[in-house]
C-alpha cells in the first residue's frame, strides 16, 4: 500500500502498515526535536551562542522567556486547533514557517530583531505545530499502547537531537569565529526543518476521527470539560514541576564551565549526551517502568526521587578541576532521570482516561501550565549567574530540589483523584 498522504482517504491506525505507522512516529518525533533546536541552542552551545550574538547570560534568558510567554499563550489554542485541523496541514505549515524564521535567525540580526524572531517561533512552533506530536503518536496506536509509544517517541527525539547536535558540534568546532559558526549551524538547521515539512506534506494521511467537522473551532465547553476531568489539573501541575526541573538541569552546562573549568569541547559533548543522547535509553526505560508499574505517575515519582539525590551530590562535591569526570557522569545521570520523567510526563492524561474528543484540548491545557517555567526560569537563573557567579549554582540546585518535592506531591494528588473517580464509576455501575 502506498505511503502517500492522499492515496487512502481517511484512515485509522489499523488501516496503516506497521512501516507507515512507525514512519509517522519517527517523522514527528524527529521533528519535535529538530524544530525546537534553534530556540534552545543555548542548552548545548551556551558560550558560543552568547559570543556569536554578542549578548549576556541575562540576554539569552530574556530571549527564551520572550519565546515562552508567547508559547504559554499559544499552548491551549494549539491543543484546540489540533482537534479541529488536519495533522498533515499543521505539520507541514509549522515546519515550513519555522524554517523561514531560522534562515532569518542565521543572519544574526540585532537583539531587537531577535525578539521578533523568537515571538515568531512561539507563534509558529507552538500555535501551529505543537499539537501534532502528541496527537499523531496517539492516532498511530491504541490507548493502551500510548505510554510505551510516547516513550519510544522520546527515544527517537533523543537520537535525532544527538545526530543533529553532533553535526552542530562539528560545525562549531571547525570554525574559529563564533558568529560564522552559529550562522552556518542555523542555515543547516533551516534546511533540515524545511525537508521535514516536505515529508509531512507528502506522507501524513487524513486520519478518521481526528477532527470534528460539526463543532466550532473554539469551544469553551471543551476547555471546561478538560479542566473538570478528574486528575487533569493535578497532572498539569505535576508536569509543570517535571519540566521546571528538566529545564533547570540545562544549567549544568555553565556549572561545569564556571565551577570546574571544564573545556568547551567536553561541556558541549556532555550537554549533547544529557540533552539528546541519554534519551536513547531514558525514553524507552521510562515507558518500560510505566508499563511494569502499570502507572506512569509512579515511574515519575521514582525519577523525581533520584534527581533529588543527584542534585544534593552537586552541592556537597568539592569544586576542583580534578572532579570534572565525576561531575560529568553525574550530569549524564541527572539527564537520564529528568529526561525519563519528561518523556512520559504527558502519560498521566491517558492514565486519567481523558477521552479522545478532548485529548488535544487537555494536552493544550497540560502545555499551558506545564511549560510556564520557560517564562521565568531562564531569566531568573541567568540573572543569578550574572550577579553571583559560581555562588549562584547552589541556589539553583536547592530550588530544583524543592520543585522536585512539590512535583511528587502533585503526582500523589493526581493518583488520589484518579482512584476516587474510579471508585465513583464502579459504585455507579453497580
What spans do the regions from the language model cover?
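C-terminal membrane-cytosol helix-exit motif in multi-pass small-molecule transporters
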Residues: 190-211, 410-415
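Helix-to-loop junctions at the C-terminal end of transmembrane segments
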Residues: 74-86, 282-295, 385
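Cytoplasmic membrane-interface "Motif A"-like loop-to-helix N-cap segments
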Residues: 84-95, 291-305
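Glycine-rich segments within core transmembrane alpha-helices of 12-TM secondary carriers
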Residues: 147-172, 367-377
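C-terminal transmembrane helical hairpin of 12-TM major facilitator-type secondary transporters
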Residues: 296-345
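Juxtamembrane intracellular "pre-TM" segments in multi-pass secondary transporters
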Residues: 3-18, 207-235
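Extracytoplasmic gate region of multi-pass secondary transporters
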Residues: 42-46, 161, 230-283, 342, ...
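Cytoplasmic helix-loop-helix junction between adjacent transmembrane helices
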Residues: 120-155
Amino acid at each position: 500500500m502506498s505511503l502517500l498522504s492522499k492515496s487512502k482517504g481517511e484512515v485509522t491506525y489499523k488501516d496503516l502498515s506497521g512501516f507507515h505507522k512507525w514512519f509517522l512516529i519517527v517523522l514527528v518525533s524527529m521533528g519535535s526535536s529538530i524544530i525546537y533546536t534553534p530556540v534552545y541552542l543555548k542548552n548545548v552551545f551556551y558560550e558560543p551562542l552568547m559570543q556569536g550574538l554578542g549578548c549576556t547570560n541575562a540576554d539569552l534568558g530574556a530571549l527564551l522567556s520572550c519565546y515562552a510567554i508567547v508559547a504559554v499563550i499559544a499552548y491551549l489554542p494549539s491543543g484546540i486547533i489540533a482537534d479541529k485541523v488536519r495533522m498533515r496541514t499543521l505539520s507541514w505549515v509549522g515546519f515550513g514557517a519555522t524554517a523561514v524564521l531560522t534562515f532569518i535567525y542565521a543572519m544574526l540580526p540585532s537583539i531587537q530583531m531577535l525578539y521578533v524572531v523568537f515571538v515568531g517561533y512561539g507563534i509558529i512552533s507552538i500555535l501551529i505545530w505543537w499539537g501534532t506530536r502528541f496527537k499523531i503518536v496517539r492516532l498511530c496506536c491504541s490507548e493502551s499502547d500510548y505510554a510505551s509509544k510516547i516513550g519510544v517517541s522520546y527515544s527517537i527525539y533523543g537520537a535525532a537531537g544527538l545526530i543533529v547536535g553532533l553535526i552542530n558540534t562539528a560545525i562549531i568546532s571547525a570554525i574559529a569565529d563564533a558568529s560564522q559558526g552559529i550562522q552556518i549551524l542555523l542555515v543547516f538547521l533551516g534546511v533540515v526543518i524545511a525537508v521535514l515539512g516536505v515529508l509531512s506534506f507528502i506522507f501524513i494521511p487524513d486520519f478518521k476521527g481526528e477532527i470534528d467537522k460539526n463543532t466550532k473551532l473554539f469551544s469553551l465547553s471543551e476547555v471546561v470539560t478538560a479542566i473538570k476531568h478528574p486528575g487533569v489539573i493535578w497532572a498539569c501541575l505535576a508536569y509543570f514541576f517535571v519540566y521546571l526541573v528538566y529545564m533547570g538541569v540545562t544549567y549544568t552546562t555553565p556549572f561545569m564551565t564556571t565551577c570546574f573549568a571544564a573545556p568547551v569541547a567536553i561541556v558541549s559533548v556532555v550537554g549533547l549526551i544529557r540533552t539528546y543522547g541519554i534519551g536513547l535509553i531514558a525514553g524507552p526505560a521510562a515507558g518500560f517502568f510505566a508499563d511494569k508499574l502499570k502507572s506512569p505517575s509512579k515511574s515519575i515519582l521514582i525519577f523525581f526521587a533520584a534527581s533529588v539525590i543527584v542534585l544534593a551530590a552537586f552541592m556537597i562535591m568539592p569544586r576542583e578541576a580534578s572532579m570534572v569526570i565525576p561531575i560529568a557522569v553525574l550530569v549524564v545521570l541527572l539527564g537520564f532521570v529528568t529526561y525519563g520523567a519528561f518523556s512520559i510526563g504527558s502519560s498521566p492524561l491517558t492514565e486519567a482516561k481523558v477521552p479522545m474528543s478532548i485529548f488535544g484540548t487537555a494536552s493544550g491545557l497540560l502545555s499551558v501550565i506545564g511549560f510556564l517555567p520557560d517564562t521565568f526560569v531562564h531569566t531568573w537563573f541567568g540573572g543569578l549567574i550574572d550577579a553571583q557567579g559560581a555562588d549562584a549554582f547552589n541556589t539553583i540546585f536547592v530550588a530544583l530540589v524543592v520543585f522536585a518535592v512539590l512535583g511528587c506531591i502533585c503526582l500523589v494528588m493526581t493518583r488520589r483523584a484518579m482512584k476516587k473517580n474510579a471508585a465513583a464509576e464502579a459504585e455507579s455501575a453497580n
